[in-house]
């Protein structure tokens, strides 16, 4: 941020007179803390004057870089000393001094820039001293809560101070990074209306801010186009039409006027990625809404369920790759592509990897969107819902093999030998209660129950919550591996005639009046009813397209000790470091783990109070110590070596 001396002194000692929009600065410091902070400040000033810590030692974006790799070149924490990690500090994401009823359920990954950490809490955006977790400033968000997923940093330009950008419902908001005050020079008094809600992290590249869209289920009107704004003044730069209007390529994939007013096909990911050598932005687009019935939208429905490459300066279309045609399962790409190079068949190719909730990892040439290891347009089961026109084929990667379970047979129902008699009996009761279970492999459509005499139930794998999810892919440039965490949770459901007056003739439902998980609850915990693993971490060698290793991740303590390694569900992703360590939380057993990134062996774990449902990050502090951080629901956890 290149703070000047006065700015650093303000951050060190606090303001005597509190002012600004919801600002609170630390004051009344003890003599010792003043001395300590002064020493820290002097170090910071000296570092700034001598170019300071290199960019690679910090964590400037949600995934560490604009390629989204989740990789850090730091190697102070190693396979040999990782077992010595201890908690350095914690920071509560609750606002104990306010009357706010907002409860934190944070999925945030902080950013660290020029020795300052920034992140959202339940009802604030805060700047912290990354060595201690002490607040430097706190900005209250009085209306809509800030995105629980993160904030982004813009370094400023031409006399304009650095800014922190965050979203709150449909507002894009700029703060002065040095003070936390609203930056009134941006937009209308520091705010810009995005035109649609977006509850994730704005993506900053040069002087461009890219945001996506969250179109609520059942909403009427409002389109999920990605948009770009000028980081200097907030003016709108471009908008990419994710459901093409007449005259634009792709409109022919929507029969008749089914494109018009169509919801979904929105860019909802937590972040974006860009190829800086080409200024090419990659936009992952979601399923059409409604997703379960597509009889009113015959066709492949571009650009839903696609990765679209555009010019980040203009939004001009370059290419696309559709991962599902005519989606009926809500199995969109939940995270943007991760960018890396592949050495395959004697050729180095600039590539990207993108997962889908359907359990697959697609590796594409990022210059043209062509699959590197091949994709097969595979015949898939067809729907019996009246009026539905299922796509006859779906694109399935030849390599790598699936990251999650994609099929099921009744022989795979869990037994007492797999877990426990109590669990197995509960699952047998569930199976008896739902009637006849159908799964015909990948992309099994929802079966239609025309009347009460039909008791057929579709069991979808992965279920509606998906296999891989928003955590995205981590890439290790040292061995060419990418790492994907996925859950194995099935969904039970069927289509039936909709209630009179409904906008569509058929509706998706299930055993409890809605689609439900193929699982039971024991002692308050979800226990899937198919054989484990229920959560798994996969390493893929991108230089061959083959799976290098795949392990269950997470334990179920309710089972006998020799049956606890079931894997547990989760949605977050991993962090990889140059010391060949992989760090991941994600699982609902509340563990934070380190693994050998080459072998998949677990080498360290820490039992947290709450779930680490967020992507971890790491940075090198001004004390030359490597810190490791993860958000655990309502608390930020920081670890370091002694």
Predicted regions and their residues:
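Long, low-complexity segments enriched in small/aliphatic residues
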Residues: 394, 398-489, 536
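Bacterial Sec-dependent signal peptides at the C-terminal "C-region" and cleavage site
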Residues: 41-54
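Short, Lys/Arg-enriched N-terminal segments with co-localized hydrophobic residues
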Residues: 12-22
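Repeat-blade elements of multi-bladed beta-propeller folds
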Residues: 59-63, 102-122, 145-171, 198-220, ...
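Bacterial N-terminal signal peptides that target proteins for export
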Residues: 21-35
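Mature N-terminal segment immediately following signal peptide/propeptide cleavage
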Residues: 52-96, 112
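Bacterial N-terminal signal peptides
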Residues: 32-44
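Extracytoplasmic/lumenal domain signature
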Residues: 81-94, 125-145, 158, 171-196, ...
């Amino acid at each position: 941020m290149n703070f000047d001396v006065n700015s650093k002194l303000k951050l060190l000692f606090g303001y005597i007179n509190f002012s600004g929009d919801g600002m609170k600065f630390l004051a009344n410091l003890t003599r010792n803390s003043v001395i300590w902070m002064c020493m820290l400040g002097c170090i910071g000033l000296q570092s700034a004057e001598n170019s300071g810590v290199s960019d690679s030692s910090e964590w400037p974006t949600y995934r560490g870089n604009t390629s989204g790799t989740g990789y850090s070149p730091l190697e102070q924490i190693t396979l040999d000393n990782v077992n010595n990690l201890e908690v350095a500090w914690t920071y509560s994401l609750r606002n104990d001094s306010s009357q706010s009823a907002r409860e934190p359920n944070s999925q945030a990954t902080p950013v660290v820039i020029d020795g300052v950490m920034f992140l959202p809490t339940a009802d604030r955006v805060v700047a912290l001293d990354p060595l201690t977790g002490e607040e430097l400033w706190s900005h209250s968000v009085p209306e809509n809560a800030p995105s629980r997923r993160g904030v982004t940093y813009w370094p400023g330009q031409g006399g304009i101070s650095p800014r922190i950008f965050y979203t709150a419902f449909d507002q894009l908001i700029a703060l002065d990074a040095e003070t936390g005050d609203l930056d009134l020079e941006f937009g209308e008094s520091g705010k810009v209306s995005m035109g649609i809600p977006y509850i994730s992290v704005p993506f900053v590249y040069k002087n461009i801010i890219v945001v996506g869209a969250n179109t609520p289920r059942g909403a009427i009107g409002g389109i999920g186009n990605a948009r770009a704004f000028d980081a200097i003044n907030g003016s709108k730069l471009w908008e990419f039409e994710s459901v093409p209007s007449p005259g634009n390529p792709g409109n022919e994939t929507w029969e008749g006027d089914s494109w018009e007013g169509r919801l979904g096909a929105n860019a909802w990911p937590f972040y974006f990625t860009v190829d800086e050598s080409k200024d090419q932005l990659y936009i992952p687009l979601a399923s059409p809404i409604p997703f379960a019935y597509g009889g009113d939208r015959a066709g492949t429905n571009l650009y839903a369920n696609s990765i679209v490459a555009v010019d980040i300066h203009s939004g001009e279309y370059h290419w696309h790759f559709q991962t599902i045609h005519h989606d009926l399962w809500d199995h969109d790409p939940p995270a943007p592509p991760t960018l890396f190079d592949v050495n395959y068949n004697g050729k180095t190719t600039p590539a990207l990897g993108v997962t889908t909730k359907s359990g697959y990892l697609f590796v594409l040439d990022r210059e043209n969107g062509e699959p590197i290891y091949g994709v097969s347009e595979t015949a898939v089961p067809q729907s019996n819902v009246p009026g539905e026109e299922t796509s006859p084929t779906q694109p399935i990667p030849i390599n790598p093999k699936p990251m999650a379970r994609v099929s099921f047979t009744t022989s795979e129902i869990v037994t007492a030998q797999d877990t426990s008699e109590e669990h197995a009996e509960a699952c047998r009761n569930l199976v008896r209660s739902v009637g006849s279970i159908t799964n015909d492999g990948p992309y099994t459509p929802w079966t239609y129950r025309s009347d009460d005499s039909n008791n057929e139930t579709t069991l979808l794998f992965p279920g509606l919550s998906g296999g891989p999810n928003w955590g995205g892919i981590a890439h290790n440039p040292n061995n060419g591996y990418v790492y994907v965490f996925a859950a194995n949770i099935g969904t039970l459901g069927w289509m039936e005639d909709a209630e009179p007056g409904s906008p569509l003739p058929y509706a998706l439902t299930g055993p409890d009046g809605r689609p439900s998980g193929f699982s039971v609850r024991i002692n308050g915990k979800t226990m899937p009813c198919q054989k484990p693993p229920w959560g798994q971490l996969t390493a893929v060698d991108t230089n061959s397209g083959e799976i290098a290793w795949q392990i269950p991740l997470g334990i179920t303590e309710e089972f006998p000790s020799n049956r606890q390694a079931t894997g547990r569900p989760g949605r977050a992703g991993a962090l990889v470091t140059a010391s060949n360590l992989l760090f991941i939380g994600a699982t609902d057993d509340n563990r934070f783990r380190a693994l050998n990134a080459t072998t998949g062996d677990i080498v360290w774990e820490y039992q947290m109070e709450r779930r680490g449902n967020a992507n971890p990050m790491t940075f090198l502090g001004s004390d030359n110590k490597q810190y490791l951080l993860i958000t655990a629901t309502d608390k930020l956890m920081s670890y370091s070596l002694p």
